[in-house]
Each structure stands twice: as structure tokens, then as C-alpha cells.
Regions:
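Active-site cores that bind ATP or allylic diphosphates and position pyrophosphate for catalysis
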Residues: 1-301
Length: 301
């Protein structure tokens, strides 16, 4: 390939401690250290933080409480897993925290921006003008914002009717959590109500949400861990040059016709991607036509 640097934001602004933490999390030592922590009945995230604290100290463990640092550590772990020569670099997040409900000058979290735009408030001072224009256009077409509440009954009906064995094949399902999900689906009135009812110390709200939506979409744990293709949604002339020079390690989808060239396994993943896009469109007041992934053209800038 022709990528030599990966740049991402983080609360620390220093790559070294992120990579140090990633190296430990990528090691057999960590796999051994975390077992007694998980046995205490806490969530994986809490067990991981405690293992890091004991092995590397409180300062490094503190990184696992910061959302952007967590993501940066995962990037570093991926680089280690792939034995890649890519060098990670981080830019420090400033002014406001992840998911902050308050703005600071021209800075606002993405959560606050989504909240303000959903309520019809002006957001142009927090985003580039082109972004504001796109959001206004989507709002005019009633295709923004999206809310899972539009699908509450459909999701609950699908999950409650799902055989127990099928639910066990969904990623992240273990330790009998599928029984709690099916029981809650019989009485919950909303998806949020279902998530709240199933949540435990070990199973976070986010994890339950992933399980339920994966079940609804038909995502199972036998899918490949890595994507079986690269999908190009848009590119500049510079991007086209990079793709031309890059050594293709995976099939590239740049046009709808390219899907026909995929293997059966890759095509199955693409069909799930299409299903997820269709689901998203159903979460807006005015839905887009289904299966637009097969018709939309590559964006060239």
C-alpha cells in the first residue's frame, strides 16, 4: 500500500502512551491478567481498565476513560495486529469533551450539534458551511435527523419472534443474555425500554443495542472479522491517484456493477451493508427509496 501515517484525534495529544497501552492490550499477558477481573462480574470495559491499572499504572488506565483515546488505542492495536509499518500520530482534542452538552466558542461536540439541529437550532457556527448546507437540505427533505423510534415496533416484533438458537449466533451474545433479551422483548414498548431492561453491570447499554440491531439486521458471528472488500463512496483526483498506485489487497467497489465481481462471502457482507442503509432510511420522517447502494454513483470532487 501507499499509506504510511494514520492521524487521529485524542484527549491526550501524545501517541506514545496510547501505543504503550495498545502493546499491553495486544499481549498474552493482558489475556491472562483480565481473567480474574472479569470473574468479579464487572463489564469487560471495567475489567480491562483495572487490569491496565495494575499492570501499567493509574495514569495509563485513565486513558481508557476517554472516548477518543479508547478509539486511538484500538487504531494502535490494529496496526500491531496487522504488523503494519503505518505510524500513528494524534492531534489533541481541545475546548470541549466528547458528548459535552455545552459549546465553547466555535467548538461543540457532535452530540450537541445533532441535538441542536434536531431541535431546529442554528448550527452554522459549529460546522463548516458546506456541512451546514447539506444538513439544511436533508432537513428540508425530512431525511434528517434519524431516530430509531420509527422502528420500535418492527424491531421488537422481529426480536421477540426470533428462535433462541438464532439469537445465540448474533455477535456479542454470551452467558445467557439472549434469554434476558427475549424476555424483555415480550413486554418492552420501545427499543430504549428493551435496552434498559436488559442492561447489567457486565452488559452495557451500547452492547445490548448492538446485539438487538445485529439480530434485526441478520448479522451473525460467522461473518469475516475483516472487511472482504473496499468500498469507495467518493474521491478527489488525488484520491484516484492513490488508488491507482496502491497495491490492491482487496476487491474495490467503486460502481454498483463491481458488486457482481465479489465472492459469495463478500457479497453477503455487502447485502448486509445495504440492509443497514435501508434500515437507516426508515428511521427518518421521509424515507429514501430502498437499495440505493446499487444505483448511486461514485462522487468525484
Amino acid at each position: 500500500g501507499c499509506v504510511d501515517t494514520l492521524t487521529f484525534g485524542s484527549e491526550t495529544g501524545d501517541t506514545a502512551p496510547l501505543m504503550h497501552c495498545a502493546e499491553y492490550l495486544h499481549s498474552d499477558v493482558f489475556n491472562s491478567d483480565i481473567r480474574p477481573e472479569v470473574a468479579k462480574g464487572v463489564s469487560f470495559a471495567a475489567a480491562r481498565t483495572e487490569a491496565v491499572k495494575k499492570a501499567l499504572g493509574a495514569e495509563t488506565a485513565e486513558l481508557l476513560t476517554k472516548p477518543n483515546c479508547i478509539l486511538g488505542i484500538e487504531y494502535c492495536k490494529a496496526i500491531l495486529s496487522l504488523n503494519s509499518n503505518i505510524v500513528p500520530q494524534t492531534v489533541q482534542r481541545i475546548a470541549i469533551d466528547h458528548d459535552s452538552d455545552k459549546a465553547h466558542g466555535a467548538f461543540a461536540s457532535s452530540s450537541l450539534i445533532r441535538s441542536k439541529s434536531a431541535e431546529g437550532e442554528e448550527i452554522s457556527s459549529y460546522v463548516p458551511e458546506n456541512t451546514a448546507v447539506c444538513i439544511r437540505a436533508l432537513q428540508k427533505e425530512k431525511q434528517y435527523p434519524a431516530s430509531l423510534s420509527y422502528l420500535d415496533r418492527a424491531v421488537l416484533a422481529a426480536v421477540s419472534a426470533m428462535p433462541l438458537e438464532d439469537l445465540r449466533r448474533v455477535p456479542d451474545v454470551s452467558e445467557g443474555i439472549e434469554n434476558r433479551i427475549l424476555a424483555a422483548a415480550e413486554t418492552a414498548e420501545t427499543c430504549t425500554g428493551l435496552f434498559d431492561a436488559v442492561k447489567t453491570k457486565r452488559y452495557s447499554h451500547a452492547r445490548i443495542r448492538r446485539i438487538v440491531l445485529s439480530a434485526y439486521l441478520g448479522i451473525t458471528n460467522d461473518l469475516p472479522n475483516l472487511p472482504p472488500y473496499l468500498r469507495i463512496l467518493g474521491m478527489t483526483s488525488c484520491g484516484a491517484e492513490i488508488l491507482h498506485k496502491a497495491k490492491p489487497m482487496l476487491p474495490i467497489i467503486a460502481r454498483p456493477a463491481d458488486v457482481k465481481k465479489l465472492s459469495l462471502e463478500a457479497r453477503r457482507v455487502f447485502e448486509l451493508e445495504v440492509r443497514a442503509d435501508n434500515l437507516y432510511s426508515l428511521c427518518t420522517e421521509h424515507r429514501r427509496p430502498a437499495n440505493m447502494d446499487y444505483t448511486e454513483k461514485l462522487i468525484r470532487i
